[in-house]
Amino acid sequence: MPNQPSGQTFVLLRPGYSTRHIAAELKSNGIIRSEDAFILWHYLHHGRSLKAGEYLFEKSGSLVDIHNRLARGDVYFHTVVVPDGFTMFDIARAIEAAGLGSAEDFLKIARTDTTLIADIAPGANSLEGYLFPDTYEFSRMMTMQEMAAAMVKQFRQVARQIGLIQSPGGETAGGGPPDVDANATPIPEVTARLVPTPDERLERTVIMASIIEKETAVAEERPQVASVYYNRLQKRIALDADPSIIYAELLAGTYTGALHHDDMQFNSPYNTYRSAGLPPGPIASPGKSALEAAMHPSTTDYLYFVADAAGHHRFARTIEEHNKNVAAYRRAMRGQ
């Protein structure tokens, strides 16, 4: 049970409880003084159905008010906040912290049950990326699948607002450049995901948006970050996105909280240092801004970017220019 305010008590009434069982639970928690009085009131007022769920009661509530709340089903809702960039692992921990069940149980749904998105993302290997960031109100009686479904529903709503999904039937719009440069020189391990089919366009956009989301929290930079990655895809240059390594290690259960140079060789299709093209799935839940950036990247010839001391990024067209930006960042960090 969650922490309850002073003078208030949580009571969980499970499906199938009889009126007498409900009265006994209320009495044992100090909500009512007499089980018989509650039962008598219930039957004198046409025996209205009492709803299962978790309730938060004031110790001083009247019998009439208590009965009416149960008849209306005024259950208690727990707030679960999902910020932009949360992974399914983060969401699972947030649900557990709210007292709504175990993180492990939520992950079982998020990692395997793709039926919730089968019509819009048939190639998805999990719900990662489609559990939309927002503030949710969940009751204790909701299943993990119902919670996941609420997040997917919000994704669909926002995706329609921005034109990523064109209709309730699931027709999708593409994001980013439509083709790869046919004259580019391939690099090892390039994958077929570089040229998505129409059915893969939404999935590609969500994958790209998730990388953009994890790379920068500065909304106005996101279209530029998107342009860097789309330019690299067109030229068949590996994305080299550090957040993809972190996610690869999260999936493997080996992430220690920090990246080291050796991690760039971590063997996973999600590691965009080792595998060219997009990873096989999103690496986080992108927010609206990141989705829009993935759909509408800036038109640039940038191929590199690095953080600066102010929390923004410096963009570069050549490796020489990029190396100068990296050196400037390191000098700034040493001077702090």
Segments predicted by a language model, with ranges:
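Signal peptide-directed extracytoplasmic domains
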Residues: M1-Q161, V190
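Bacterial extracytoplasmic/cell-wall-associated proteins, especially those involved in peptidoglycan
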Residues: A97-G101, T115-Q336
